[in-house]
Amino acid sequence: MGKEYNWRSAVNIMKTIHIICEGKTEVDFVNKILWDNLGYDKYRLEPKTIITNADKKAGKIYKGGVSNFAKIDRDIKRVLHSIKNTDTYITTMFDYYGLPDDFPGMVQSKSITDIYQRIEKIEDALGSCYKCSQFIPYIQLHEFETLIFSDIESLKKVFFDECDSIGWQLLYDTIKTFKNIELINNGVNSSPSKRLKQCIKSYDKVYSGIQALQSTDFKLIRQQCRHFNEWITQLESL
């Protein structure tokens, strides 16, 4: 009698990754950029936006934004309970900027000065809420638009006639000032998205960022964004 053939080891099992996102921008990023770079033949990505409110009478569901942790927790648990096999995972993509105070680890991490250690504290706290090896918590430093600062030249190609030389110089100066673009802070008027909007008046938070990133080398984004790269590396190793 011949040796039993292990089809599982011979066939590349496609991994399913549910990504709980803050809003439409992140969903578009997953569908249009992240999936392409991870590989359509290796992964099936399922981005899901946080449900913020539901009007049962009107039959409407409202999505996007993170006002409190309870809504996030509800959606994460819903997906976790739906996982039926070991080839399915769940991760998150929330901006550090604007996280609610009741988010796990937020209060405890405020005394930590090193931003990477602070984010690690928050992610660990989020992970401990579920104690599931298939759950990979990720918080974006400081917000989604940080990724756009990885290549201002690509941004110029998309918005070349919508920002003057002074505006472009301000963006270049921002990179020089911080050196590490993941450190561009989360102030009300100084977060990455606010800096972009100040220089590019037509910048739209939902659509413009995706336009710019589609023209940017994904490898360059990973090189410029240490924490983001660590997340991608984790997903690639599944």
Positions of the model-derived regions?
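C-terminal accessory helical subdomains adjacent to catalytic cores in phosphodiester-
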Residues: 1-13, 27-59, 73-238
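Catalytic nucleophile-elbow at a beta strand-turn-alpha helix junction centered on a G-D-S/GDSL motif
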Residues: 18-28
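Non-catalytic terminal and connector segments of soluble metabolic enzymes
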Residues: 63-69
